[in-house]
UniProtKB/Swiss-Prot annotation:
EC number, UniProt record: 3.1.1.1
Cross-referenced NCBIfam families: PRK05077.1
Keywords: Hydrolase, Serine esterase
Coiled coil: none
Name of the protein: Esterase FrsA
Family annotation (PANTHER family): DIENELACTONE HYDROLASE DOMAIN-CONTAINING PROTEIN-RELATED, ESTERASE FRSA
Name of one Pfam family that matches: FrsA-like
């Protein structure tokens, strides 16, 4: 089946698909304080989703392309779930968030198919994969159209990997008690086995969102990157996120001695946002298998346990948390009680001495991850490093912060 035919088949209207903002039904969508964060973007009036320009541009999307798609959504006069929110158009049609971003992805998919130069074709496939992922964002459970966009993103990513430098292998890992999970091992040029970074991504991202991290920071240093999806999304969708948040990553770590391309004696974990919750758990529970752990904007305690902090977080992000926990209809109080159990301090881990070297990068006044969370991580480590990343200029400082983190990982890993 051709890629174009697959798109037509997946998105063929069958019934009235639920609109994304209606999938979690607990929170009152009232006025909220404006939020701006380097890793999560910012709240913009009249949008349900946070607009994450920095990360989308970092992944290779042109800022003008973002504005063009937003404009198409804004200009639509189709029926919306909430007339005050542009990105709540009902049904797969013009103006719907998933429709517009997927349509943009198909443009690049067609360019990729028409391009004869393999590397340029690979770039176009990667661009399409990123746009399909934005279409599926924020990846709420039960969002049928988003899941179809994710399937197209994975297909495009596999096409890109066949054409881009280095080697990528799709790997299946067995997890006792449930379905196996699929990960991607990205390997630089040269002979393995390679020192490897196990990526622990945020809850609102897919494993295929981190190719830029591999290409710009790890591959030039001869470091491989292994990704898996977080529980409840993508290739890990059959697994619910639980208080044992590192379960899937632990089973992957235990399998690495049997992966010939990975030097299992030189493995690091790198956690973005809630992925840092996973990475720090690994530092405590799997210290013999991990050389180092690095975190960026970690969600390990305050957001999970402080009601005032939760009140400052946008509706969309709380919906993501509720969706991952399988609490689509729970009360606010029930969600607060459950989130508290995910705090690594409440679990009795953070605060105890940890032998694994840990670095944590943070931004001042980050609504999702205060400085205290990063200090708690680094002060718990026998070899901790605290890294403050200035906010402005946001893109340059983000890049500089990632370079410093990669330097730190390389020094201890290689």
């Amino acid at each position: 089946m051709t890629q174009a035919n697959l798109s037509e088949t997946l998105f063929k209207p069958r019934f009235k698909h639920p609109e994304t903002s209606t999938l979690v039904r607990r929170f009152s969508h009232g006025a909220q304080p404006p939020v701006q964060s380097a890793l999560d973007g910012k709240t913009i009036p009249h949008w349900y989703r946070m607009i994450n320009r920095l990360m989308w541009i970092w992944r290779g999307i042109d800022p003008r392309e973002i504005l063009d798609v937003q404009a198409r959504i804004v200009m639509s006069d189709a029926e919306r779930t909430d007339d005050d929110l542009y990105d709540t158009v009902i049904g797969y049609r013009g103006g719907n968030w998933i429709y517009e971003w997927a349509t943009q992805a198909m443009v690049w998919q067609q360019k990729a198919c028409a391009e004869e130069d393999p590397q340029l074709s690979g770039r176009h496939w990667l661009h399409a994969a990123t746009l399909y992922n934005i279409a599926a964002y924020p990846h709420l459970k039960g969002d049928d159209l988003a899941e179809q966009a994710q399937a197209l993103s994975n297909r495009a990513y596999e096409e890109a990997a066949q054409r881009l430098p280095g080697t990528m292998r799709q790997m299946e890992f067995t997890v006792p008690g449930g379905a196996p999970i699929t990960g991607f091992l990205h390997m630089p040029k040269g002979d393995g086995p390679f020192p490897t970074v196990l990526m622990c991504g945020g809850l609102d991202a897919m494993q295929t969102d981190y190719y830029s991290l591999y290409e710009r920071y790890f591959a030039p240093r001869g470091i491989a990157m292994l990704t898996i999806d977080m529980p409840s999304v993508g290739f890990s969708s059959k697994w619910k996120l639980t208080q044992d948040s590192s379960l899937l990553h632990q089973h992957v770590l235990k399998a690495l001695p049997n992966v010939p391309w990975v030097d299992h004696t030189r493995v690091a974990a790198f956690g973005f946002r809630f992925g840092a919750n996973v990475a720090v758990r690994l530092a405590y529970l799997e210290s013999p298998r991990l050389k180092v752990v690095a975190c960026l904007g970690p969600v390990v305690h305050t957001l999970l346990s402080d009601f005032k902090c939760q009140q400052q977080v946008p509706e969309m992000y709380l919906d993501v948390l509720a969706s991952r926990l399988g609490m689509h209809d729970a009360s606010d109080e029930a969600l607060r009680v459950e989130l508290n159990r995910y705090s690594l301090k409440v679990q009795g881990l953070l605060g105890r001495r940890c032998p694994t070297p840990m670095l944590s990068g943070y931004w001042k006044n980050d609504p999702f991850s205060p400085e205290e969370d990063s200090r708690l991580i680094t002060s718990s480590s026998a070899d901790g490093k605290l890294l403050e990343i200035p906010f402005n200029p946001v893109y340059r400082n983000f890049d500089k912060g990632l370079q410093e983190i990669t330097d730190w990982i390389e020094k201890r890993l290689c």
